[in-house]
Design a protein with these regions (language model features):
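Cytoplasmic juxtamembrane regions at transmembrane-helix boundaries
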Residues: 101-116, 242, 250, 445-455
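Alpha-helical transmembrane segments and their helix-start/interface "positive-inside/aromatic belt" motifs
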Residues: 25-36, 161-171, 370-375, 453-462
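Membrane-interface helix-loop-helix modules in multi-pass inner-membrane proteins
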Residues: 61-87, 133-136, 140-148, 385, ...
Length: 494
């Protein structure tokens, strides 16, 4: 069996184990065992990949396997990874692992919750290892479907509205995406849906590219919270349970940026060159609009949700700059934001679980009451605003340096506008930290609250270690990513 298939097999075994498990301890045991195995497998895969590259293996995708699945449509179960895929698998495994501990005390319907959570995880892992267009789309849909139930059943606030809005908008994006994928397949004249073989043929007519590229980019862009299709994201984040928000913002939204780069840009480079300016304007709006919107929110989850719109907009913005440095920064930003936003949502969930409010106006003085959670919140905020030594700094600096390499007025003007988001982010992060962590607590019920439990500390410490590790030692992963973006970027250079 191909090693990559482990990332689909383990979630399947977890589903079977959860189905058979009786009692909360057995359910937790299945989840911890499965999530730990996935994390170990992703770390092993990372070292295997780096070892292959060090040994001189220059293949675009490593550890490939192809099994014909449905001959009439040339659909295969085709898997393979490059540095981008490996990084995304590692991110996904970290967040599934920490999300398991963040959901440790979730009640009721614990078994059903973890069944859907595991199915969502399987869709994410399957998407990142797939190199067949149809298989990618299948896993993409598997990842989206559980969101409706996870938010609608276990969410809070206007959960039914948020779940339906999220589902309808993302399924609308999926319709665009399916049309785009079919257009790519038939337009290329390929006898397979393997994206590497379609890229090698490189014969989709330019006129067709100009039709299928916008559809594909928009299809994935909806999931990446591209303006003006971002409105599902804040409502979905605000209503979702803690671990679902972590996986949703930390990983699921990254499927959008990954798909735009891996499929839309890679398979239709001429259209990407011709039409990128349109989407650059939209992504530039996402970056600034998301940051400004975060400034005026009073709900902790909405603040982080709009912050995610801004940061994910920056990912798409960098991809559209069509050069290696900016594209490398985009993938680093996907990693950095995935870790940071998962940390934020975990901490917000822990604070809400104690105070039963997410309203900034009702929170104050938490540093004296919950020092561990408060210090961790400060670290998350500093990473979000780009403090050197944490992951946000290296990702954003790589993006802006790469974006400024385009020496025309249009690209540089947009880059300067996007850079303003750094200042805006500092405004809402520092205001938020000062308001909820310091000052005098006026709610007497908050004075008796306890700090983080052991399971919460495991989740938070893991994420902080990853944020700091990526910020202080980024070279190995940036080098791995930089090599992998080159085959795509080389086709984009006019």
């Amino acid at each position: 069996m191909n090693f990559l298939s482990i990332f689909v097999l383990i979630p399947l075994l977890m589903l079977a184990g959860l189905w058979a498990a009786q009692g909360i301890k057995a359910i937790r045991g299945v989840m911890v065992t499965g999530a730990s195995t996935l994390l170990i497998a992703s770390i092993v895969l990372t070292f295997m990949y780096l070892g292959e590259r060090s040994a001189g293996n220059t293949a675009e995708m490593l550890f490939r396997a192809d099994t014909l699945w449905y001959a009439p449509l040339h659909i295969s179960y085709s898997v393979g990874v490059d540095g981008i895929s490996v990084a995304m698998l590692l991110l996904s495994a970290i967040i599934v692992f920490t999300g398991t501990f963040a959901s440790w005390r979730l009640q009721p319907l614990t078994k059903e919750y973890f069944l859907w959570f595991t199915l969502l995880s399987m869709g994410v892992f399957g998407f990142f290892i797939s190199i067949d267009l149809f298989t990618m789309f299948m896993f993409y849909e598997i990842a989206l479907i559980p969101m409706y139930l996870l938010i609608g059943v276990w969410g809070s606030g206007r959960k039914e509205y948020a779940a339906m809005k999220l589902t309808l908008m993302l399924m609308g994006g999926s319709a665009f995406l399916l049309i785009g994928i079919l257009g790519i397949y038939f337009g290329s004249g390929a006898t397979t849906m393997n994206l590497l073989e379609i890229a090698q043929l490189h014969n989709i007519p330019f006129a067709q590219q100009c039709i299928w590229f916008p559809l594909t980019f928009l299809g994935f862009g909806v999931l990446g919270a591209l303006f003006p299709f971002h409105t599902w994201s804040p409502d979905g984040h605000a209503s979702a349970p803690t671990a679902v928000s972590m996986l949703h913002a930390g990983v699921l939204m990254k499927l959008g940026g990954y798909g735009c780069f891996r499929i839309a840009m890679y398979l239709m480079p001429e259209a990407a060159n011709e039409l990128s300016w349109i989407f650059l304007i939209l992504t530039g709006i996402s970056v600034v609009y998301g940051a400004f919107s975060a400034c005026v929110q009073t709900d902790l989850k909405y603040i982080n949700a709009y912050s995610s719109v801004s940061h994910c907009g920056l990912v798409l913005f960098a991809i559209l700059m069509l050069n290696q440095t900016a594209a490398t920064g985009a993938i680093l930003q996907m990693l950095s934001h995935g870790l940071m936003t998962a940390l934020f949502f975990a901490l917000i969930g822990m604070i809400y679980g104690r105070t039963h409010t997410r309203d900034v106006r009702e929170l104050a003085g938490l540093m004296k009451i919950m020092p561990f959670l408060s210090v961790c919140y400060v670290i998350a905020g500093l990473a979000n605003l780009g403090l050197p030594g944490l992951s946000g700094f290296i990702a954003e600096m790589t993006i802006f340096v790469g974006s400024f390499q385009n020496n025309d007025v249009f690209h540089r003007t947009l880059t300067i506008i996007a850079c303003s988001s750094i200042v805006i982010t500092a405004v809402y992060i520092l205001r938020l930290v000062g308001k909820i962590l310091y000052g005098t607590c006026t709610n007497k019920h908050h004075l008796t609250l306890t700090d983080a439990t052991w399971d919460e500390r495991v989740a938070v410490i893991c994420l902080i270690a990853c944020v700091a590790g990526l910020g202080m030692a980024p070279f190995w992963i940036s080098h791995m990513i930089g090599e992998s973006v080159l085959p795509v970027v080389s086709q984009l250079i006019p």
